[in-house]
């Protein structure tokens, strides 16, 4: 399974945030889907693509992404 998260490039994140999000989201997704590969990048709009998974897998990954984003204060430091 491949998971791709796109972040709107007109709303840049702090330095190191893309790498940190990739790592943290990857850890959380791999707990449920050990074969998943996670990519996070800038693009024209925010988005989520899940390739090679069922509809229920996408729903679960959306929940994981939401939890990861909301807990950013716990795992990301812009210093």
Swiss-Prot record:
- Any one GO biological process: SOS response
Q: Does this UniProt record's set of keywords contain rRNA-binding?
A: no
The cross-references to InterPro entries, in alphabetical order and at most eight, read: DinI-like_sf, DNA_damage-inducible_DinI-like
Per UniProt, the keywords (alphabetical) are: DNA damage, DNA repair, SOS response
Pfam family for this entry, one: DinI
Question: NADP: is it a keyword of this entry?
Answer: no
Which Gene3D superfamilies does the entry link to? Answer: DinI-like
Q: Per its UniProt entry, which superkingdom is the organism in?
A: Bacteria
Family membership, please give it: Belongs to the DinI family.
What the protein does? Involved in SOS regulation. Inhibits RecA by preventing RecA to bind ssDNA. Can displace ssDNA from RecA. Inhibits NucA transcription.
Name it: DNA damage-inducible protein I
Q: Which organism is it from?
A: Serratia marcescens
User: Which gene specifies this protein's sequence?
Assistant: dinI
């Amino acid at each position: 399974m491949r998971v791709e998260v796109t972040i709107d490039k007109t709303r840049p994140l702090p330095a190191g945030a893309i790498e940190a999000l990739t790592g943290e989201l990857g850890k959380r997704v791999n707990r449920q889907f050990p074969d998943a590969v996670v990519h996070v990048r800038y693009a024209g709009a925010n988005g989520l693509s899940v390739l090679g998974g069922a509809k229920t897998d996408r729903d679960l990954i959306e929940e994981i992404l939401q939890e990861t984003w909301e807990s950013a204060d716990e795992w990301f430091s812009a210093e």
